[in-house]
Amino acid sequence: MPNTKSAEKALRVADANRQENRRAKSQVKTSLTKVKKLVDAGSINEAETAAVSAQSNLDKAAEKGIIHPKNAARRKSRLMKKLNQAAK
């Protein structure tokens, strides 16, 4: 339990930030999974449009500091590698 008003506010702020970070991470994971499923199903055109959204989600998460920028770059690279291999 917080003992001061500032500690109460810090608790509220931390909770709000945690919820936002969890939402953003979940959105990233969902968009990546969607692309992978579309690639596995052979829907390359739909996968390409979903990949644009996934890259955007990764960039936004990296920009906000939710994930490390190099983590976002690595995930985008692997995603596009998988998409390009499926397109061949």
From Swiss-Prot:
Pfam families: Ribosomal_S20p
GO terms (BP aspect): translation
Region (Disordered): 1-29
Annotated Basic and acidic residues bias: 1-23
Recorded GO MF terms: small ribosomal subunit rRNA binding; structural constituent of ribosome
Disulphide connectivity of cysteines: none
UniProt keywords, alphabetically: Ribonucleoprotein, Ribosomal protein, RNA-binding, rRNA-binding
Coiled-coil features, chain-numbered ranges: none
One cellular component (GO) term of this entry: cytosol
Keyword Membrane assigned: no
Family annotation (Gene3D superfamilies): Ribosomal protein S20 (1.20.58.110)
Family listed: Belongs to the bacterial ribosomal protein bS20 family.
Role, per record: Binds directly to 16S ribosomal RNA.
PANTHER family on file: 30S RIBOSOMAL PROTEIN S20, SMALL RIBOSOMAL SUBUNIT PROTEIN BS20C
Protein name: Small ribosomal subunit protein bS20
